[in-house]
Amino acid sequence: MVDKIERIKELVEILNKYSYDYYVLDNPSVSDKDYDKEYDELKLLEKETGFVLPYSPTLRIGDVVLQGFNKYTHKGKLWSLDKAQSLDEIKDWHNRNIKFVNEMRAQGEDLPDLKYIATKKFDGLTVNLTYNKGGMLEVSATRGNGEIGENVTSQVKTIKSIPLKLQENDDLFEVHGEAIMTQEAFEKYNASADIPLKNLRNGAAGALRNLNIKETARRDLSAFFYDVGYKEGYQFKTYLEMMDFIKEKGLPIDEYLKVCTSIDDIKKEIEYIEKIRFDLNYDIDGLVIAIDDIRTRELLGYTVKYPKWAIAYKFEAQEATTKLLDVEWNVGRSGRIGPTAILEPVELAGVTVKRATLNNMDDIKRKGVRIGADVFVRRSNDVIPEIMGTLENTLENSEEICPPTECPACGSHVVLNGAHYFCENTLSCKPQLVKTIVHYASRDAMNIAGFSEKTAEQLFEKLNIKSISDLYKLKKEDLINLEKFGEKKSENLLNAIEKSKDCKLYSFIYALGIPNVGVKTAKDIVNKFKSIDGLKNATFEELVSVQDVGDIVAQDVIEFFKEEKVINTIDELLNLGVNPIFDEVKIVESIFKDKTVVTTGTLQNYSRTEIKTKLESLGAKVSGSVSKKTDYVIAGESAGSKLTKAEELGVKIISEEEFEKMLGRES
């Protein structure tokens, strides 16, 4: 028993070191296979002995669903920052600082010349971590009102870059940071999500405010830390010294820390960050400029709301205010009934916005949204606009938004499942069936050319097509009398339907519309199980062993294939001649095998999809962003910030011509 406990302690130390190397230093020190082997050994030993260290990596993802959030009082206040939206406002602030320093010097204070540190302003959710004298992560909390936040320790523990125990620590301290969702994590989550996330910020905020810890873990959040709000013992002399302390403790920081000594320096940094912001793998909404010298900060002090020694330069907002005219309830493919806001038209980021997203009734209540009131609308990175909140002074004479009592499409009974309402009529509810057929026919699914939602609606209304299998029973005489369907169009559609019978297995699995199974997940599970029967009979343990398949997806797959209606539909499709084929991907032995490759710019001989497919056939991992883990960057014409970052990190850069020569040397 003693030997096993010693081995547990050893494994925890080793695995935490691996995580630090991978997530903080961006420099993996072990293969995924070796990490998984030692992680599995640790899980087994913990189960056998019942001994689990409070900073064990196995505690990062639990089966816990919490009952609610407890309040936490911060030891040091988390202040908001005053905001500037023009360089003139920054100049005014700078001039006030100069005047103050000169006045203090006249009174005998030995203050240094003003030096500012510019950092990115992350657009996520602020978190405050408390580490005790032993270095243990004691509490993690949201900002709240700056003095009292909500305890989200279990949620924050899922962020793999955050150490659960520091190697060395003598003094209790609180450290402030921002929990964020990267673009990569966002795309990966949405590829298999039944309800896709709208933007990165909501992805992060929603994860930390989710009581289901496994769902939080699925979001795969990251974090950056930038401030020590409270510390016992030694106090810092400068902000740069503080940042060195944060880094030395093993907490992730952003390497962008620019020293500015003049307005011209600040202007250059603003221009630089504005130029690269949309090439970053995460969202930022501005630049923070803060005085470096701590004594100067102490003397400057605070207003009621803000520290006087820092200011945030905010990029042009993509928000506007308008009136909520109505709420429309729409039925999706899964039967989920979702609210859409009907707005008084408003110009936002160069587009006239008339509709916006409202996620569910919980979201409506939390934001205090009411019909007739004015609402804040945000449009981020060309996604569907979303309502962010309500102007309280416009609530008079507004109307409460009521949830649906019946399906708005078919009038059937609705049920509340979690935060969402669902129509139970899966047999004849038009939007459900139409969208199911449209999804089945879509390009990434069965790729039935010329098939549209309008076509699906006509098939439902005029020909009583209510199942995907009914598509293969259509005849020319059925189609020819439909609106805008002549002989030629009817023949083309029938040929496309016939052609779809010979399909790839992963396309067929994706076409079936399994909840939370996107194209990538369909490919991954097909590569594991290789046939429909293999997937039908897959166990929970077998499913979660597939890369990127978690408990929720695994359970969704199992429940899907339990439904008699699903099995009958699949059997009918196969009897009608649908022939899903599994093509084993043959990885060519290549210099690119197991290498991480990023492409940037325009290539002459490959589209984006073609180069990705080519690299994957060579065994490469294709990434959308450059990091220290990147092995090669293939640079085409008009290569942008990815090329610049690769040069800064010393990543091997090759041209398209060099790429093909490397392949030629291998053949």
From Swiss-Prot:
The BRCT domain, residue ranges: 587-667
Highest taxon listed in the record's lineage:
Bacteria
Q: Which GO terms describe its biological process?
A: DNA repair; DNA replication
EC number(s) recorded for this UniProt protein? 6.5.1.2
**Catalyzed reaction equations:** NAD(+) + (deoxyribonucleotide)n-3'-hydroxyl + 5'-phospho-(deoxyribonucleotide)m = (deoxyribonucleotide)n+m + AMP + beta-nicotinamide D-nucleotide
A GO molecular function assigned to this protein is:
DNA binding
Entry GO CC: cytosol
Catalytic residues identified in the record: K121
What's the short name of a Pfam family annotated to this entry? DNA_ligase_aden
Family annotation (SMART domains): BRCT (SM00292), HhH1 (SM00278), LIGANc (SM00532)
Q: Does the keyword DNA repair apply?
A: yes
Which residues bind Zn(2+) per the record?
A: C407, C410, C423, C429
Q: Mind listing the UniProt keywords for this protein, alphabetically?
A: DNA damage, DNA repair, DNA replication, Ligase, Magnesium, Manganese, Metal-binding, NAD, Zinc
Q: Which cofactor does it need?
A: Mg(2+); Mn(2+)
InterPro entries per UniProt: BRCT_dom, BRCT_dom_sf, DisA/LigA_HHH, DNA_ligase, DNAligase_adenylation, DNAligase_N, Hlx-hairpin-Hlx_DNA-bd_motif, NA-bd_OB-fold
Which residues bind NAD(+) per the record? D32, K33, D34, Y35, D36, S80, L81, R143, E178, K314
HAMAP family assigned to the protein according to its UniProt record, in alphabetical order: DNA_ligase_A
Q: Which family does it belong to?
A: Belongs to the NAD-dependent DNA ligase family. LigA subfamily.
Q: What does this protein do?
A: DNA ligase that catalyzes the formation of phosphodiester linkages between 5'-phosphoryl and 3'-hydroxyl groups in double-stranded DNA using NAD as a coenzyme and as the energy source for the reaction. It is essential for DNA replication and repair of damaged DNA.
What name does this protein carry? DNA ligase
